[in-house]
Design a protein with these regions (language model features):
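Divalent metal-coordination and catalytic microenvironments
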Residues: 10, 25, 46, 57, ...
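Short, structurally constrained coil/turn elements
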Residues: 35, 148-150, 243, 296
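Active-site core of metal-dependent hydrolases
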Residues: 157-170, 179-299
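Active-site gating loops and adjacent loop-to-helix segments of metal-dependent hydrolytic enzymes
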Residues: 64-104, 181-184, 212, 230-248, ...
Length: 300
């Protein structure tokens, strides 16, 4: 049988050297020397061949907008202790004053071509949904999702960056985003002004997710405040709503400041809810305790 592609002398992460046979867009065999011919052949020369990259959290609607962002926003977000995170987000949100759908599509296309070149196969793409961005970012990402459907798997997240309770009109726009075809319900509950409103934020997201049978991805506790508890409420809500294994918590930086007793209880809850955690180590000085999460059996 003629194969489409054979990658010879590939080194797996285990250190094993083997041939990888590809046909009809799928890996057919990983093993010793592959006999027969192939339409294409690559000699990996003993170098590492591994899985494609997955970007689980990317604000794709905002790529290549650095010229619009103020330096003060970056300084606040990366500051010691991350006490100015909310101010940084509010300052950076001014980029949405420049939102034009066609321009977003053009910027995103350039980034996706580069991502594809570097081996990215899947992206969970966040698009701001609020009274400033309205549906512009979502519409742009839905168009680019279709354009790249045979190249990169893109999930569009309807993301209420500026809150739901504190930003009247956003809840309706989230429903409209899902009607347009967004894949995932987003959230950022800690951005709300009170703990009560943070819980309402999460409750609304679950109502929307259940209506559209959609997964949930939220930015939780993304500041240097050890009193933040939205990761806990998100996990308990996943259990209560029967959304086990369908929820992701991104950033969750405040967990780095939790005392050991509470952190262990939180890990047990996250595992029970099968909540995945996205660490985003390239942004901000605080990070989730990755090793502790992995040791607790949580997907990171």
């Amino acid at each position: 049988m003629t194969q489409d592609l054979v990658i010879r002398n590939a080194r797996l992460r285990s250190g094993r050297i083997c041939d990888i046979t590809v046909a009809a867009g799928h890996i057919q065999r990983i093993g010793e020397r592959t006999a027969g011919s192939a339409r294409g052949e690559i000699d990996a020369q003993g170098k590492l061949v591994t899985e494609t990259f997955v970007i689980a959290h990317l604000h794709l609607d905002k790529v290549m907008t650095g010229s619009f962002a103020e330096e003060a926003a970056l300084e606040q977000y990366h500051g010691s202790g991350m006490g100015g995170t909310m101010t940084a987000i509010e300052t950076a949100s001014r980029v949405k004053e420049h939102y034009v759908e066609s321009e977003i599509v053009d910027r995103v296309r350039k980034v996706l071509v580069e991502a594809e070149y570097h081996g990215v196969s899947h992206i969970r793409a966040f698009a701001d949904v609020d009274t400033k961005a309205r549906l512009t970012g979502v519409s742009a990402l839905l168009k680019i999702r279709e354009e790249f459907k045979n190249r990169i798997g893109i999930q569009v997240v309807a993301f209420p960056q500026d809150g739901i309770i504190r930003e009247p009109g956003t809840e309706e726009l989230l429903y409209k985003s899902m009607d347009l075809g967004a894949d995932v319900v987003g959230g950022i509950p800690w951005i709300e002004y009170t703990d009560e409103d943070s819980k309402k934020h999460i409750d609304i997201a679950f109502e929307i997710a259940k209506k559209y049978n959609a997964d949930i991805a939220m930015l939780t506790d993304d500041a240097g405040d050890p009193e933040l508890r939205t990761t806990e409420y998100l996990a308990s809500s996943a259990i209560r709503n029967g959304w086990i294994g369908r929820v992701a918590a991104c950033h969750a930086r405040a967990t780095a400041l939790y005392n050991e007793v509470y952190h262990r209880k939180l890990c047990a809850l996250l595992k029970k809810a099968e909540v995945g955690v996205v660490s985003d180590p390239h942004t901000g000085p605080l990070h989730v305790r990755v090793k502790d999460l992995l040791d607790a059996g949580i997907t990171v």
